[in-house]
Amino acid sequence: MNIVLMGLPGAGKGTQADRIVEKYGTPHISTGDMFRAAIQEGTELGVKAKSFMDQGALVPDEVTIGIVRERLSKSDCDNGFLLDGFPRTVPQAEALDQLLADMGRKIEHVLNIQVEKEELIARLTGRRICKVCGTSYHLLFNPPQVEGKCDKDGGELYQRADDNPDTVTNRLEVNMNQTAPLLAFYDSKEVLVNINGQKDIKDVFKDLDVILQGNGQ
């Protein structure tokens, strides 16, 4: 099965991707992993991508698509794949459709994990880190035994600048604006399935699993 996994930051994509991989053995392919592998292998496209990344510039779509093509052509993807972080735009989605068509394949499911904005903000702003040892906590999911203190060494816990509510809210709004056209594109293709990501982790996976087994709409 050929899957695209979508969801805003904090929606739990990584957790659910791990569960899909564990059950189905489908390779989890993220944009970052693809770039790192291509660069490490020293492929022509990897060298090109590195030149843009070293300058702090966006990697052009044609290079990104080429790297995706190389990755999806590997034998571990013969029975399917789980794409995470790609495509990000409608032109990328159209290019992905074309390259898959050239391979006699197509996207079967686009799974979009939906979580309310307020819940995402709570999830993303709850992280706290020890100033002494760097241990990470979460006020909702993994709180310290003593508020504001590290369990290991009693060090002061702090919130990273990019975890503050204003920064998180802005990041979410940017992501929402970017993904809206892509969601509409896949909805028009009748492959988009919205999943309620506010449930317990196990229940979210149950809903995903129903779709992957072909028993859901």
Swiss-Prot record:
Region spans: LID: 126-163
EC number: 2.7.4.3
Keyword Cytoplasm included in the entry's annotation: yes
Pathway: Purine metabolism; AMP biosynthesis via salvage pathway; AMP from ADP: step 1/1
Chemical reaction(s) catalysed: AMP + ATP = 2 ADP
Predominant localisation class: cytoplasm
EC class (word): transferase
Temperature-related behavior of activity: Optimum temperature is 35 degrees Celsius. Thermal denaturation midpoint (Tm) is 43.3 degrees Celsius and is raised to 60.4 degrees Celsius when AK is complexed with the inhibitor Ap5A.
Gene Ontology, cellular component aspect: cytoplasm
A molecular function (GO) term: zinc ion binding
Sequence positions that bind Zn(2+): C130, C133, C150, D153
One of the Pfam families matching this protein, by short name: ADK
Binding site for ATP: G10, A11, G12, K13, G14, T15, R127, S136, Y137, K199
Key word Hydrolase present: no
Function: Catalyzes the reversible transfer of the terminal phosphate group between ATP and AMP. Plays an important role in cellular energy homeostasis and in adenine nucleotide metabolism.
Name of the protein in its database record: Adenylate kinase
Chain's gene name: adk
